[in-house]
Amino acid sequence: MASKCLKASFSSGSLKVPGGAGGGSARVSTIFSSSSCKLPSFSRGPRSFSACSVGLGKSSCRAASCLPALCLPSGGFATSYSMAGGWFGEGILTGNEKETMQFLNDRLASYLEKCGSWSGRTRSWRAASTSGVSNSALPVPDYQSYFQTIEELQKKTLCTKSENARLVVQIDNAKLAADDFRTKYETEVSMRQLVESDMNGLRRILDDLTLCKADLEAQVESLKEELLCLKKNHEEEVNSLRCQLGDRLNVEVDAAPPVDLNRVLNEMRCQYETLVENNRREAEDWFNTQTEELNQQVVSSSEQLQSYQAEIIELRRTVNALEIELQAQHSMRDALESTLAETEARYSSQLAQMQGLIGNVESQLAEIRCDLERQNQEYQVLLDVRARLECEINTYRGLLDSEDCKLPCNPCAPDHSPSKSCLPCLPAASCGPGMARTTCSPRPICVPCPGSRF
């Protein structure tokens, strides 16, 4: 009735073996813990069979209808076989299934033997390695010279890198200085062009003023010629009048004193001369005032032009400074954008890695949950099997007790009363453990426990 158990302590593992008569394959999951073992039953289609013991080099099998499928109720060396089809049917073992059980037991025994031999070899190798290392110390080569050479090369590399960085900084500074000089040259060229354009404008104004001066001088000359012509005409008229008066007779008449023509002519001459002088003076004054006004306008316009040019120069300098600052801001913006893009790319890659890790962890968690559910189902199945096996054990115990009751109490005494079969103590409600039993009473036949399975 008792099954053989193996005392071992190993880690868990799995083994895939061929199936029974119907083909297919079976997965053998082994869990090595303490010193006891239990094996559940196989099931394929309508039949079921159980393996109750596994030993080193030998095995024993019996049908599920005859013996329980587990050796011990808890702990130990457990081997579970899961195949296609339902769990725990009724039937007997066939020849192929017995061969499969024999094959599995042989394989398991060989595996345990190999594990033991490998553990012994490992211990022996460790002992040999520790003893060899302690006995003979290997010579350690001297790498100090190589280290010194490496340090010198590293120092040279650092010096070269610093020199390269300094040269790069100098090149950048030279480029910036060249850009500044280029901008200054462009500003000076633009200023020279503006000054040349202003000079051309002033030349035009000077030419216009020169033309005006020439016109005024021509007008003065024409006025002088006109004055000379008037003087000449006046002299001719005076001479003609004198000639006319000289040819006449002098007649003295007692009358009012005559008018002195010479005096009148002299007065007229003086009047005309004063009038001409006034006209000349007025023309000169007008010319001088116009010239002074023009000179003042030229001076004021030149001063305004200089002030405007100074303002233009200052504005251009401000514009150049603002352009340089704008270029610096653009370069800073480009650098910040590149840094932002690099940061986004780095964090996106890190985020992708984190998401991948999260996905892996979630998949592992899902697998763990599936394993937990599967183990829970297996545990429930094993609990069901345990309950059924305890029920069968109680049934077998009742049968054995009934067989014991059938035997006579005193076999040597003569039988004077009719024999009655003695039934086993039946449980009050069910065949579960811990239930109360009824007293033995003679019955004509032995009845199994209700709810038991054969």
Curated annotation (Swiss-Prot):
User: Is Glycoprotein included in the keywords of this UniProt record?
Assistant: no
Which residue stretches belong to region Coil 1A?
Answer: 98-125
Q: Where is this region: Coil 1B?
A: 143-243
PROSITE patterns referenced in this protein's UniProt entry, alphabetically: IF_ROD_1 (PS00226), IF_ROD_2 (PS51842)
Region annotation Linker 1: where it falls in the sequence = 134-142
Keyword Nuclease recorded: no
**Pfam families, from UniProt?**
Filament
Q: Which residues does the annotated region (Coil 2) include? A: 260-403
Q: Which UniProt keywords apply?
A: Coiled coil, Intermediate filament, Keratin
Q: Which GO terms describe its cellular component?
A: cytoskeleton; intermediate filament
**Record InterPro entries:** IF_conserved, IF_rod_dom, Keratin_I
Locate the region Linker 12.
Answer: 244-259
Q: Which GO terms describe its biological process?
A: epithelial cell differentiation; intermediate filament organization
Q: Where is this region: Head?
A: 1-97
A molecular function annotated in GO for this UniProt entry is: structural molecule activity
Q: Which residues form the IF rod domain?
A: 97-407
- Highest rank taxon of the organism: Eukaryota
| Region annotation Tail: where it falls in the sequence | 404-454
Q: Which family is this sequence assigned to?
A: Belongs to the intermediate filament family.
User: What's the protein here called?
Assistant: Keratin, type I cuticular Ha5
Q: Which organism is it from?
A: Bos taurus
Name of encoding gene: KRT35
